[in-house]
């Protein structure tokens, strides 16, 4: 196997063991600062924001990839081992399994203290308004976020790291960060964020569908309803404005026999969304743990798939 696959294995294990340590200043924060600074600069300059959007997207992704390439080149000058360590660390910081699971567990724990505490905690990981959410709505929001993050935070990074090492992984992370900061359809971001949103859709197109397949298989392996997960994916995979989000959400909804999606408030305004899955039963706190199990199992399946392909090659 190539060194970058070994580095990916090491990075994957580090994420499982350590997550994102609180003392580590995450590279995504640096990317976010650049995006915020450049967005303000482009807005002040005026002109056609749709053209500026392309520059914002391209400069963020290419600059990120260039910095990672420079780091790897410098480490490579020191020898194979320093390069392997650098790649492993960059892969580790680009994967978000344990940190997402930890946030989800935090919501479940907060709900034990009451709905108000649950609302405060879930606000850390969702974009919708949370001040009026019921306990069941908090649980559903958490399950949705975990299932979406299985694509954005795990399967996509692993796929791009396997194809192009840390350079391609961090190109994807830059695009994902752009989408989370400016890739909205509201009046403020419609022009400056359109290219970031489209790039994120393109980059997640294959990983989203792969994630759904992995989640269906994982459902069988961990005792959830894989057959129903597959049925709901086939039926509801298009029930979202995004071409990608409903794939993993429908797999989770089917595996858990709960209904996700529906209308929610964002910035005080209701946003109508189709439902995903069937309301076979009310969502319960244990569904957060089940969603985390799906996250871990799907991630492990993806890593095994990458290693097997690397061995065969």
Label each region the model flagged.
Residues 1-175, 183-313:
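Hydrophobic alpha-helical transmembrane segments
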Residues 180:
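Glycine-rich phosphate/dinucleotide-binding loop and adjoining beta-alpha-beta core of small-molecule
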């Amino acid at each position: 196997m190539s060194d970058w696959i070994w580095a990916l294995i090491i990075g994957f294990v580090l994420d499982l063991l350590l997550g994102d340590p609180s003392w580590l200043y995450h590279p995504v924060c640096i990317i976010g600062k650049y995006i915020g600074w450049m967005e303000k600069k482009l807005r002040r300059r005026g002109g056609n924001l749709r053209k500026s959007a392309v520059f914002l997207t391209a400069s963020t992704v290419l600059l990120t990839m260039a910095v990672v390439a420079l780091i790897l080149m410098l480490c490579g000058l020191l020898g194979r081992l320093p390069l392997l360590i650098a790649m492993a660390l960059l892969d580790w910081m680009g994967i978000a399994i344990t940190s997402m699971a930890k946030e989800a567990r935090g919501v479940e724990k907060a709900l034990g203290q009451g709905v108000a505490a649950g609302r405060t905690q879930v606000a850390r990981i969702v974009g919708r308004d949370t001040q009026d959410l019921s306990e069941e709505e908090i649980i559903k929001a958490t399950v949705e976020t975990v299932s979406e993050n299985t694509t954005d935070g795990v399967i996509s990074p692993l796929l791009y790291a396997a194809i192009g090492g840390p350079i391609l992984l961090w190109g994807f992370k830059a695009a994902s960060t752009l989408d989370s900061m400016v890739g909205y359809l509201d009046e403020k971001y419609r022009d400056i964020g359109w290219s970031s949103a489209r790039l994120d859709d393109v980059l997640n197109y294959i990983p989203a569908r792969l994630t759904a397949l992995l989640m269906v298989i994982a459902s069988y392996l961990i005792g959830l309803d894989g057959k129903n997960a597959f049925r709901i994916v086939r039926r509801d995979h298009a029930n979202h404005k995004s071409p990608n989000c409903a794939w993993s959400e429908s797999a989770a909804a089917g595996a858990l026999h709960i209904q996700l999606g529906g209308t929610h408030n964002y910035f005080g305004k209701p946003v109508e969304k189709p439902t995903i899955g069937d309301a076979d039963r009310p969502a319960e706190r244990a569904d957060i743990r089940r969603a985390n199990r799906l996250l871990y199992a799907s991630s492990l399946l993806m890593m095994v798939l990458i290693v097997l392909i690397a061995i065969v090659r």
